[in-house]
Amino acid sequence: MVGGKVEAEEIVEFEEMLRELYKEFGFDNEVGSKQKQFTGLPATSYPTFSDFLESATRNIKEIQSGKYSKLEEQVVVKTLILRDKIAKIIRNIVKTYGKFFDGYTTIDNIADEQIITFDLSILKELKPEVFDASIINMISLCWDNCVTNGKIMQKRLDEGSIKMWDVVKTLILIDESHRWLNAKKIQALELISVYLREARKYFGGIGLASQRIADFAPEGSGNEGIEKLKNIFELTQYKFIFRQNSSAKRLLLKIFEGELTENQVNKIPKMEVGKCILSISGDTNIEFKVHLTKDEEKIFQGGL
């Protein structure tokens, strides 16, 4: 939300402020944590950013009004500087981006919903830090739901109360995925990498769509981002590759090293509409043409 790097001491102080906040709301992990329920409560039981700002402001004033020795003053001054910096960031979130981050969720229990959509049309126009923070929230929400649902389904499957075809699965579908999953967004790449590695254990899957592979590696992307992006493609079992610009051949060879032959890469810029290569990890590559029926063409609202 602030751009740049965050120092370790800022993270430690931020965590301490969060502990104070949750303690005020009755979530004290030091006392009776085994008996008290922390999860599964109504959304209104948990604090918002406005609550955090109020708590931070109040605690700063309490620290300022205290009496300290000269030695203690040095520590207190440093603490106040850190807390004031954090409070300013929280205030900016509440005042400027409160519409997106400050408030209670409209989905009280995501497990009760069959289909959930996220509209990114407004978010994509905001500065990168805000967009990325929203995306991380969405990924985390979907991943948490996948794990929760997957454990329940596995338990019922093991008990024999349901059959495999009765298992409720989790599928994440992202169109224009290059907007938030590219070589410059390291944290998002790491989260999706974890999802790709572990989601299958919880009956989860993901589909990523984009028009140009070059959009996944925008100009200025570093080697770390490229390698993490390559890892995403390696972990993806099925890849449908349609026609790409000839300028993308070098990137295709790098991303699909060991999966696509040079001859197949050379074919990609010359493919006709509908033709593609299906690359199956650990198996083979299949070249075929996607057939679009008249009924499908009527409801299709994209481009050619």
Predicted regions and their residues:
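C-terminal alpha-helical "lid" subdomain
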Residues: 292-304
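P-loop NTPase motor domains
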Residues: 1-204, 278-282
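Short, solvent-exposed amphipathic alpha-helical segments in soluble enzyme
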Residues: 134-137, 256-257, 293-295
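Conserved ATP-driven motor cores of ASCE-family P-loop NTPases powering translocation/secretion/packaging/pilus
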Residues: 1-4, 184-291
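Solvent-exposed, flexible loop/coil residues
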Residues: 104-105, 114, 272, 294-296
